[in-house]
């Protein structure tokens, strides 16, 4: 049991690291494309450096705000999903009970199988 919990914890840590690296790589790519128009020099000039600092800061700040909103909304979202799940699992049960207690209906013996007016 202990080993299984450790494996789950390691898997969660790997998922967190992967998610972080995906965000970091995307941010790096986006800011580099916006702020470094040419690769003629080895070092960044002051304008490029300021642009990168501003771009990364803006994306990090946005990410923090999104995560705060996500953390705030998550309990309500989980609660709603649980209610939906419970309602969905109750519907088939109720339908089965209705089928067992309701009298069977027979089809009307009208013009079945005959095409339209005659």
Swiss-Prot record:
Keywords: Disulfide bond, Membrane, Metal-binding, Mitochondrion, Mitochondrion inner membrane, Protein transport, Translocation, Transport, Zinc. Residues 89-118 are annotated as: Disordered. GO terms for molecular function: metal ion binding. The keyword Mitochondrion applies. Residues 98-109 have a biased composition (Polar residues). Pfam families: zf-Tim10_DDP. A motif (Twin CX3C motif) lies at residues 31-55. It is a peripheral membrane protein. Disulfide bonds join 31-55, 35-51. One of its GO terms (cellular component) is TIM22 mitochondrial import inner membrane insertion complex. GO terms for biological process: protein transport. It is found in: Mitochondrion inner membrane. Belongs to the small Tim family. Component of the TIM22 complex, which core is composed of TIMM22, associated with TIMM10 (TIMM10A and/or TIMM10B), TIMM9, AGK and TIMM29. Component of the TIM22 complex, a complex that mediates the import and insertion of multi-pass transmembrane proteins into the mitochondrial inner membrane. The TIM22 complex forms a twin-pore translocase that uses the membrane potential as the external driving force. In the TIM22 complex, it may act as a docking point for the soluble 70 kDa complex that guides the target proteins in transit through the aqueous mitochondrial intermembrane space. The twin CX3C motif contains 4 conserved Cys residues that form 2 disulfide bonds in the mitochondrial intermembrane space. However, during the transit of TIMM10B from cytoplasm into mitochondrion, the Cys residues probably coordinate zinc, thereby preventing folding and allowing its transfer across mitochondrial outer membrane. This is Mitochondrial import inner membrane translocase subunit Tim10 B. It comes from Bos taurus (Bovine).
């Amino acid at each position: 049991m202990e080993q299984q919990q450790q494996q789950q914890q390691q898997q969660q840590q790997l998922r967190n690291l992967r998610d972080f690296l995906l965000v970091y790589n995307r941010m790096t790519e986006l800011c580099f494309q916006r702020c470094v128009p040419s690769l003629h020099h080895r070092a960044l000039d002051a304008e490029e450096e300021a642009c990168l600092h501003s771009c990364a800061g803006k994306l990090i700040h946005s990410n923090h705000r999104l995560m705060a909103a996500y953390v705030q909304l998550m309990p309500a979202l989980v609660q709603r999903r649980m209610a939906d799940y419970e309602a969905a699992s109750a519907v088939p049960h109720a339908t089965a009970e209705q089928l067992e207690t309701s009298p069977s209906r027979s089809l009307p013996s009208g013009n079945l199988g005959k095409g339209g007016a005659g």
